Amino acid sequence: GGGWMRTGETKVGKRSFVGNSGITAPGRKLSKNSLVAVLSSTPKKTKAGANWWGAPPERMRRVTVEVNSPANSGEALTYNPGLAVKAARGVVETMRLLAPMFSAMLLAATLSVYYSLLDALGFPLTWLLSGLVLMGMGAVAMAVTVAVKWICVGKHRAADHPLWSAFVWLNELQDTFVEVVAAPWFFQHTYGSGEINLGLRALGVEIGRGAWIDSYWFPETDLIRVGEAATVGPGTVVQTHLFQDRVMSLDTVTIQDGSTLAAHSVALPASLIGTASTVGPGSLVMRGDRVPTNAVWQGNPIEPWKR
């Protein structure tokens, strides 16, 4: 402030976690075994094992998530993976390079088509047809992304998966195609249109008639329902997973008929926005929250809002 930029050392302690869009400001330290929730900030002072949510931050109760499996003996699938598991993850992570490679191929194909049209038809007709070419490439990008999603993970289901498991890696692989292929070639040009609804439906999102969607951040698509005439604003995240104690927990998110999740808000797993209700911009709908029918809630975390 005041024309000055502040810098400082920031520390995140051992086995601590800062959620998506969480902030640990300059000069602050998050003690070990602690958690800062999505869209939340780290307080000035923290104790080991403390958990925080909201902005300004408040203490939060937390239940430890464990994987009760012989394969996770000695935390082999969470904190202490063996060499074979690391190698397997490395193979899948390397496959994420396929996404930018395919996107580059689409760019090369687009330029090749433009060159052919220019040579055969001249500039005026090429200019008139250029939009159709881009629409065709967008359709190809979307089709490939849908195919990769169904090959990698099939249908998403509510469940818990340790960090060092094939499902988590393959889920990240298909999400890379969403971000690197489908987003620049399709989603980012179709916000608020019927086409984005078609693309999200193909990935598994249940979308009602007349829904207006201005975001493609629907991570585990099959776990999301957007009702008829509902609104999902720009920059919103319908987040169907949480990573806690290095376990990926998946659950449903429901946005009922006529309801609104306003701009730059986040809805966490197991949450529900009731019929004809509104969650204001920049809000955090916590895990398991239920916004009642015909209500207006806002805040981080959300609370009833009197207009």
Predicted regions and their residues:
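Structural signal for interior beta-strand "rungs" in well-ordered beta-sheet cores
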Residues: 1-54, 58, 200-202, 206-304
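Terminal amphipathic alpha-helical/low-complexity segments used for targeting or macromolecular assembly
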Residues: 49-204, 289-307
